[in-house]
Amino acid sequence: MCGKLTLPLKPALLTSPMTRLTLLSSLVLLTLLAGCSAPEGPATRLPKANVLPLAIDDAYQFRKILTSSFDPEYVETETKNDMITFERARRSFGAVDSTEMAQRYGNYYTIFWRNSTRSDVTLRLEYRQAGLGNFVMAKERFYPDTAGSHRSTFEVTGDEFSENGGVTAWRALLIVEGRIVALRQSYMWR
């Protein structure tokens, strides 16, 4: 016989029951915390977008704004781009009939922003839709006592999209104490 292929294991680190219990509880806690990042709820829709004073502050800034449209009237049904196919599949995931699918058509905005000073921040998306002309619609998200990098999402979908049309122009605002401290807008915003 050439020898044993397995070596006897001596669990040096896991000898005491207290060490095993600590390791097990750490794994359970880590698993629970990994599932705590819940998706954002719907943004608050404002009846009227109030005009606010402009006071730009370098401590607040937009990093990137991603826009996407999911409208079958203006998008070709077949594409060879895998990323576009995946994005459409992600947006329509879970829709079981044409009514649910129609509620997912619209414009989607993902906004990456950051602030270096801890404060109460309101992120507002103001937008104009094709069927409303120059009337400005607005949605907000409030972040109490926050600092650091953030990712926020806004959707203009469902009845709002089907009745008023797609978004023609938009602007994103960071608001602190009733003042606009950061601003980013689309080319068509005036």
Q: What are the roles of these predicted feature ranges?
A:
Residues D57-F93:
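Post-signal-peptide N-terminal segment of Sec-exported extracytoplasmic proteins
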Residues A34-L52:
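Bacterial Sec signal peptide processing site at the extreme N-terminus
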Residues E78-N115, R151-E155:
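Contiguous beta-strand segments within globular domains
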Residues F142-H150:
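Short proline/glycine- and polar residue-rich coil/turn motifs
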